[in-house]
Swiss-Prot record:
GO MF terms held by the record: heme binding; iron ion binding; monooxygenase activity; NADP binding; oxidoreductase activity, acting on paired donors, with incorporation or reduction of molecular oxygen, NAD(P)H as one donor, and incorporation of one atom of oxygen
Subunit: Monomer.
Protein name: Erythromycin C-12 hydroxylase
Listed PROSITE patterns: CYTOCHROME_P450 (PS00086)
GO biological process, one term: macrolide biosynthetic process
EC number: 1.14.13.154
Enzyme's top EC category: oxidoreductase
Pathway info: Antibiotic biosynthesis; erythromycin biosynthesis
UniProt keyword Electron transport present: no
Functional note: Erythromycin B (ErB) is not a substrate for this enzyme.
Record's compositionally biased regions (Basic and acidic residues): 307-322
Length: 397
């Protein structure tokens, strides 16, 4: 039995949600044995994510011997973050993202074309779809796509018990160094021969009057590549799992595809791919009246915030028709670090679900298939999701 002092693993979702509910009620701000502070309630999580002056995104502040990674946008605070984000923001405007829909649909149909009655959703669609799209945006060749999965898989497999452990920072660097070296080589190529892609835009850009060097551009590209495919890979699996648990929504989506965006949004709240986000304190502060010292790590539980009854009515019920009452689901972050690629992730998952329904009607999770595997840490979702293609809801009515 999990105690209040033990954080359950991501693979046991029931135990994790029970623990988060207990913490929201009994210890909404809590320090673990590693000295990391955890925040569980929606209002408090939102406050931490919004206040970048007090809660920095740079984890190296509290890791002995670590130094900031130039260009790693999700670890950079304003005002540098604002300037760096502006470099690629035009690639993520609503119009630009909307223009990607035909390509996303073509890729999705192509990937599903050879799927049989039984297949692994992650291998067939959830991984290759977002990798293809983000790699094309960056200008990376198809022959390298499989390698990206190896790198991201190695990253989420790193044992991360103590996030302040200097050895952990070294292990992360060991995993990311080959990816960064690969992207650094691509940056050098684009600097010599620029094209119409995000890497070319990065190497030619100026931030505060100076050009980004290849290391900064490569680190920025690393962040875009990893975030650009892990989120959709995990989210699409979570959508199918959730609809499998609530099958009436397969029929509702088939009858009215206009409901699909709300389904995607509700799954984001219900099962966020990244259930927690970390910050570090720049000064002594308080959260919900609890003193927190300077230079410590603060772990905000987005999954818990999204299940907070003070923010969402009946939060443990999956309800795509719910009205938030003004409370935001925080799965893409909040404030200046709100995920740049959120519109792309929403579009990819909407199109993917539309095409799944058009081809199969519905999918059923094959729980007896030994390939079914959940991530143990970092992300909430399935590494492999075996599914069975169902008959069309219109045919089985």
């Amino acid at each position: 039995m999990t105690t209040i002092d033990e954080v359950p693993g991501m693979a046991d979702e029931t135990a994790l949600l029970d623990w988060l509910g207990t913490m929201r009620e009994k210890q909404p701000v809590w320090q673990d044995r590693y000295g990391v502070w955890h925040v569980f309630r929606h209002a408090d999580v939102q406050t931490v994510l919004r206040d970048t002056a007090t809660f920095s995104s740079d984890p190296t502040r509290v890791i002995e011997g670590a130094s900031p990674t130039p260009g790693m946008i999700h670890e950079i605070d304003p005002p540098e973050h604002r300037a760096l984000r502006k470099v690629v923001s035009s690639a993520f405007t609503p119009r630009t993202i909307s223009d990607l829909e035909p390509r996303i649909r073509d890729v999705t149909r192509s990937l599903l074309a050879d799927a049989g009655e039984s297949f692994d959703l992650v291998d067939v669609l959830a991984f290759p779809l977002p990798v293809t799209i983000v790699a094309e945006l960056l200008g990376l060749p198809p022959m390298d796509h499989e390698q990206f999965g190896d790198w991201s898989g190695a990253l989420v497999d790193i044992q991360m018990d103590d996030p302040t452990d200097p050895a952990l920072a070294e292990r992360i660097a060991d995993v990311l160094n080959p990816l960064t070296a690969y992207l650094k080589a691509r940056c050098a190529e684009r600097r010599a021969d620029p094209g119409d892609d995000l890497i070319s835009r990065l190497v030619l850009a100026e931030v505060d009057g100076r050009a980004l060097d290849d290391e900064e551009a490569a680190n920025f590209s690393t962040a875009l590549l990893l975030a650009g495919h892990i989120t959709t890979t995990v989210l699409l699996g979570n959508i199918v799992r959730t609809l499998d648990e609530h099958p009436a929504h397969w029929d509702a989506a088939a009858e009215d595809p206009g409901r699909i965006p709300a389904i995607v949004e509700e799954v984001l709240r219900y099962r966020p791919p990244f259930p927690q986000m970390q910050r570090t304190t720049t000064k002594a502060t308080e959260v919900a009246g609890v003193p927190i010292p300077a230079d410590v790590m603060v772990n905000t539980w987005v999954l818990s915030a999204n299940r907070d009854s003070d923010a969402h009515d009946d939060p443990d019920r999956f309800d795509p028709s719910r009205k938030s009452g003004g409370a935001a689901q925080l799965s893409f972050g909040h404030g200046v670090h709100f995920c740049l690629g959120a519109p792309l992730a929403r579009l990819e998952n909407r199109v993917a679900l539309e095409e799944i329904i058009a081809r199969f009607g519905r999918l059923t999770v094959d729980r007896d298939d030994e390939r079914l595997r959940h991530f143990e840490q970092i992300v909430l979702g399935t590494r492999h999701l075996p599914v069975l293609a169902g008959s069309s809801p219109r045919q089985s009515a």
